[in-house]
């Protein structure tokens, strides 16, 4: 199953191999949600899905809460707004409007992801999404993926939190899948990046918490 979003480092293509390293357990915990490919390709009784990016978590919450309303509004936008000037107008509203609802911000986030350059997700130091227009002829509207996600999401809790906060919520028996951002990648880790110090801190936290949970850490840059 493909994911709702285009995403750098999406694990869909390697899930058949990755699943061999994920033990059984009552709950899968993901401190770095990304595209949610791991949630979509596994079958745990429940999930705790976290990310520090509020736009990402807002999207997942809105799709889970009202899949049909989300599809209706997003599909209309995809049908009518594949133009450069419209893309930048939507990006402007997404970044600066104080009146935009969380629902519309989720719709816009999907639109920007699918119409922006290479599906990248990047913010400037002010926290503004700054990916340029991708100039694609016919961006794919992931209706099938949205419906599948909404169904699986009924088993999940989505939180906007740092990896520290997420790992502090572990319970005995949890399975943790960690795919931290690569050092120095174009996509970054929200506004502040993910530094070498963050990598060491994550390793320390995982070691401290290992008595509670089983871990699978996937990081080509480690």
Where in the sequence are the language-model features?
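SAM-dependent nucleic-acid methyltransferase catalytic core
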Residues: 1-13, 21-24, 66-177, 181-189
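Conserved S-adenosyl-L-methionine
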Residues: 10, 21-79
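Short active-site oxyanion
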Residues: 24-27, 45-46, 153-157, 207-213
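Short, polar loop motifs at secondary-structure junctions
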Residues: 32-37, 145, 218-221
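Conserved acidic-Pro-Pro-aromatic motif
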Residues: 172-222
């Amino acid at each position: 199953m493909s994911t709702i979003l285009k995403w750098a480092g999406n694990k869909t293509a390697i899930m058949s191999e990755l699943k061999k390293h994920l033990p059984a357990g009552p709950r899968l915990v993901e401190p770095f949600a990304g595209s949610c490919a791991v949630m979509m390709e596994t079958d745990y009784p429940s999930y705790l899905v976290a990310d520090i990016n509020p736009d990402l978590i807002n999207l997942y919450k809105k799709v889970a809460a009202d899949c049909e309303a989300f599809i209706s509004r997003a599909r209309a936008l995809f049908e009518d707004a594949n133009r450069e000037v419209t893309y930048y107008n939507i990006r402007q509203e997404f970044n600066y409007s104080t009146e935009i609802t969380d629902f519309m911000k989720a719709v816009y986030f999907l639109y920007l992801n699918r119409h922006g350059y290479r599906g990248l997700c990047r913010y400037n130091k002010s926290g503004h999404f700054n990916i340029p227009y991708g100039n694609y002829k016919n961006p794919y509207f992931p209706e099938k993926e949205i419906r599948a996600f909404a169904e699986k999401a009924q088993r999940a809790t989505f939180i906007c939190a740092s990896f520290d906060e997420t790992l502090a919520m572990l319970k005995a028996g949890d399975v943790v899948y960690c795919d931290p951002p690569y050092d120095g990648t174009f996509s970054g880790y929200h506004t502040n990046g993910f530094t070498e110090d963050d990598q060491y801190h994550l390793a320390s936290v995982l070691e401290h918490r290992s008595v509670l949970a089983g871990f699978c850490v996937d990081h080509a840059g480690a």
